[in-house]
Structures are given as structure tokens and as C-alpha cells.
Amino acid sequence: MLDIQLLRSNTAAVAERLARRGYDFDTARFDTLEERRKSVQVKTEELQASRNSISKQIGALKGQGKHEEAQAAMNQVAQIKTDLEQAAADLDAVQKELDAWLLSIPNLPHESVPAGKDETENVEVRKVGTPREFDFEIKDHVDLGEPLGLDFEGGAKLSGARFTVMRGQIARLHRALAQFMLDTHTLQHGYTEHYTPYIVDDTTLQGTGQLPKFAEDLFHVTRGGDETKTTQYLIPTAEVTLTNTVADSIIPSEQLPLKLTAHSPCFRSEAGSYGKDTRGLIRQHQFDKVEMVQIVHPEKSYETLEEMVGHAENILKALELPYRVITLCTGDMGFGAAKTYDLEVWVPAQNTYREISSCSNCEDFQARRLKARFKDENGKNRLVHTLNGSGLAVGRTLVAVLENHQNADGSINIPAALQPYMGGVAKLEVK
């Protein structure tokens, strides 16, 4: 959520920055709401002053024996009380309308974010590693994976399209990847591992920005009988739960940064993705991801963003996977992000790079919703900055390992860093 004080003091400048990311901020509507709010507040203050003044007179009038005048004054106070209740209701209505609108407004892009309308205008930062040149006709991860235990038909039979069953060697490799990622982040990068719920309420999703704007992308869960029925949601990412661990809290500054990680399934309806990536693991309704979240001092957040990108890169380097880093342009950034880097891994069968990690600095956008604060050196409570990043998407990493490390006979070489998590197995072979 944007800072309302910033909106009030720099409306035109905020509107201009939002326009950079394709959002048309209605300044006339904002001005109208602000005028209504100010009018009600002025009326409330005038009524309160009048009530206080008349209340002081009542005692004096009674002391002078002027009972009729005292009663008239008491009647005035009673009417003012009624008027104040109405003014409070009017102010609450204006504030609710303003708050609901603010929840739908995206974050302001950082000044360093390149301008652009969509993904075609993202900017490449660097490429790392050289895509392998194969001397045989390569297969995609579907043809490689099915003989090793990747079962798309089984997933569809159980749950419908975009679900997958893994068994045997593929299931073990998938698990090994997640464990390797967690160990790297906790033992080398200093994150604390968490296990968090996979089902959350709407307040939790509102805190990180998925609600109210992106309800159609979420899986709903209903529980209870007719009288106690409640709606909750399957998490689309562990960013939601990890970031919400600091909601409604004041963190001592010496405890910052907080570095949190979790391995979880992620559930997404993929609304609007009909017809995209219908083959294989690239776009699933359920997939695993190892998430990184950092809660930091505001002055450290952009330094931290670069650090988190490096943490995700370390996984790709260890797995010997070619990749590139791109800066998302203003028109392609996520709703809550002020700046985002995507890491894209080379997928040989598609002859292109595909997103495998997204690392974002949300600045204080989420923290304002969450009331996540820290106490600075002067004893003042300030909003923290929150950052999140994939470290990495496990299914897409599996795709990359299968395709980049394949052999002509359909076997898969296991990267050396991953072999301890595979019981020393150096190659997956069709049995």
C-alpha cells in the first residue's frame, strides 16, 4: 500500500510514477475523496469544540440556579452527540472507500527501473554459462522424464490438467533439488528455515498484496457447515506466509536483517494462461518452490536485492546450468514490486531462456499493509522493507537439469553438487 501522506503532498508526482508502469491514477477522484474527508474532519472538530464549550457552561448554569438554561444546554450537547456520531459514520465511509482504492494501486517503480510496456522491453543484465552444444538430437523434459517416472497422465487422472505425478528416480531428484536449495540457503547464505501453513486467510494474502486484486489466481478452500462456513486460500508462494510472520510487530533494529526461507508447494489457478505451456512442467497448478524472504532496514534494501539475486545464482552455478539475469521494465513488474530481477535458465528443447527465479524489493509497500515496523536508533518506529525471491522453482529446475544434462541414450548426468543428495548416484538411467 502506498503512503497516503505521500499521495496527499505529491499527488501529481505519484500519478506520474504510476503512469510509468501503465497505471492511470485518477487524481480527480482522489481530490474529491480528500475534500470529503477534510470537510467531515473540519465539521467533526467544530462539533467537538462546541460540545466542550457548552459542557463547561452547564455546570456554571446549574450553580447559578438557571436550570432551564442548563437543560437547554444539555439538549444541545445531546444533539451534538448525535451529529458527531453521524460525522464519524461519514468519515468512516470515506476512509473505507479510500482504503479499498489504495489496496488496488500498485507500488511505485524505483527510479532505476527501465521504462517499458511489457516483457519485450526488459533489459538483460548478464549471461552466465554457455549453452551446451549437443552432437545428437535432443529430447525435451517430457520425453526424457516419462521413462524415469514423470507421469502427466496420472496427474490428469487424479486432478485434471496441469497436475503431475512423479515416482521413482524423478521423485527422488525433485526432492534432492529442494533439499540442496534449502541447505545452500541455510548453511551458506544465512537464512533460517521455516515450515509454514499452506492454507491462509484473506487478511494474510492482503498483507502481501495478492488480495484483493488477484483473487482469480488463487485456489479457494471452504470449510465448516452452513452457519460456520469460512473461505480460505491455498498459498500461491511461501512469500505470503514468510513475510506475514512479521505482521503487527516491532522488530529491534539490531535483529535486522531477518533472513527466512521455506520449501513449500505453491498453488495457482493460472487464470489467463489458457493455451500457454500446455506441455510438461513449465506451468502447473501445483509446483514446489524454495522461497527466500528478507526483512531489512530501509537503507539496506537495494543492497539486499543484489545479494538475493546472488543467492539464487549460486544454486544455478552449482547445478551447472546456463542462465541470464534481466531487469524487469516498469510494465512487466509484479503488483507489489518497486524493482525486480528475473533469472532465466536455458531450456535447450525450447532454444530459449525461461524464468526460474524472480527477486523483488517491495520497499515498504507490504510492510505498510502488515504494520511491520522496527525501532530505529532514535527509538522511533519505522516501516521495514521486505524482499522476496525464488531460490528456486523446483519443477523448472528439474526441467533444466533433465534437458541440459541429458545424454544420447536418454540418461541424465547428475551435477556433482547434487550427488550427495542422491545417495551418490551420478547418473539417472532408464531401467
From Swiss-Prot:
The keyword Phosphoprotein does not apply. Pfam families: Seryl_tRNA_N, tRNA-synt_2b. GO terms for cellular component: cytoplasm. It is found in: Cytoplasm. Gene3D superfamilies: Bira Bifunctional Protein, Domain 2, Serine-tRNA synthetase, tRNA binding domain. GO terms for biological process: selenocysteine biosynthetic process; seryl-tRNA aminoacylation. Keywords: Aminoacyl-tRNA synthetase, ATP-binding, Cytoplasm, Ligase, Nucleotide-binding, Protein biosynthesis. The gene is serS. ATP binds at R268, S269, E270, E355, I356, S357, S358. Belongs to the class-II aminoacyl-tRNA synthetase family. Type-1 seryl-tRNA synthetase subfamily. Homodimer. The tRNA molecule binds across the dimer. It comes from the Bacteria. This is Serine--tRNA ligase. It catalyses: tRNA(Ser) + L-serine + ATP = L-seryl-tRNA(Ser) + AMP + diphosphate + H(+); tRNA(Sec) + L-serine + ATP = L-seryl-tRNA(Sec) + AMP + diphosphate + H(+). L-serine binds at T237, A238, E239, E291, S390. Its EC number is 6.1.1.11. Pathway: Aminoacyl-tRNA biosynthesis; selenocysteinyl-tRNA(Sec) biosynthesis; L-seryl-tRNA(Sec) from L-serine and tRNA(Sec): step 1/1. It is an enzyme of class 6 (ligase). One of its GO terms (molecular function) is ATP binding. Consists of two distinct domains, a catalytic core and a N-terminal extension that is involved in tRNA binding. Catalyzes the attachment of serine to tRNA(Ser). Is also able to aminoacylate tRNA(Sec) with serine, to form the misacylated tRNA L-seryl-tRNA(Sec), which will be further converted into selenocysteinyl-tRNA(Sec). Coiled coil: none annotated.
